Regions:
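A general secondary-structure junction signal
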Residues: 49-51, 112, 184
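Arginine/glycine-rich "motif VI" loop of SF2 helicases in the C-terminal RecA-like domain
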Residues: 39, 145-146, 172-173
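Small-aliphatic-rich amphipathic alpha-helix that forms the alpha element of a beta-alpha
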Residues: 28-29, 33, 106-166
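A glycine-rich helix N-cap at a beta->alpha junction
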Residues: 68-79, 168-192
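C-terminal helix-cap and adjacent tail motif
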Residues: 5-12, 175-208
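N-terminal amphipathic, basic helical "cap/leader" segment at the start of enzyme domains
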Residues: 1-103, 207-208
């Protein structure tokens, strides 16, 4: 698959088939993540790839398994989500946070070595490592798409990252930015409508 085709086809998917991913494909996808630009040229990234369902069950035990309609509406108000398309996307995504990762063929936990306090940076340069790992994550999304798979993602809420550390045993100086689920999309998987944006409306030549 050509690069621009993979970029165009990449979508966050939350409905997966029950289908294993060959280990060599997983390694290609993770290797694509390792090719991302890195702030200090050290690529101090590691990836925990979880295929064992018992481990996945334990890892995800802290994540809510659903949300009531009343709580969903309150969340939209609390987060000031007033756009109709945005509300529709959240109504689809929030109830699936547990199931989407449980049903994925693998769950990947990307980790970066913390050399600064990412959650309490002194300046924007202290976020360089955090920015780099997200470049790696995007490569994983695009490589998964190119291989015929799709990804879903959850950023840890509350103590989910600390809980994950207890389950998976990664070192204290490594930071977990997200959970990634990778799998084969179901034929009827929900595709969230994206905002239609004309690139010409977002480019400012030479100055704003």
């Amino acid at each position: 698959m050509e690069l621009y085709e993979a970029i165009e086809k990449r979508r966050t998917i939350r409905d997966f088939e029950n289908e294993a991913i060959p280990s060599e494909i997983i390694e290609r996808i993770i290797n694509a993540g390792l090719q991302a630009p890195t702030n200090d040229h050290m690529r101090d990234w590691h990836y925990i790839v979880i295929q064992d369902k018992n481990t996945v069950i334990k890892l995800l035990d802290i994540i809510p398994k659903g949300i009531s309609d009343e709580d969903m509406e309150q969340l939209l108000k609390d987060w000031n989500l007033s756009d109709c398309e945005q509300q529709s996307a959240y109504r689809n995504a929030v109830p699936k946070q547990h199931k989407m990762l449980m049903d994925a063929s693998v769950v990947v936990i990307p980790l970066l070595k913390q050399k600064t306090d990412i959650l309490h940076p002194d300046n924007i340069s202290h976020l360089n490592g955090f920015a780099s790992i997200w470049c790696s994550i995007e490569n994983i999304f695009l490589a998964s798409t190119a291989e015929g798979y799709a990804c879903t993602l959850r950023v840890p809420l509350g103590d989910e990252d600390k809980y994950a550390k207890g389950v998976l045993g990664f070192p204290n100086d490594y930071f977990m930015p997200c959970f990634i689920g990778i799998g084969k999309p179901k034929k009827d998987a929900s595709i969230i409508k994206q905002k239609d944006i004309n690139v010409k409306d977002r480019i400012h030549w030479d100055r704003w």
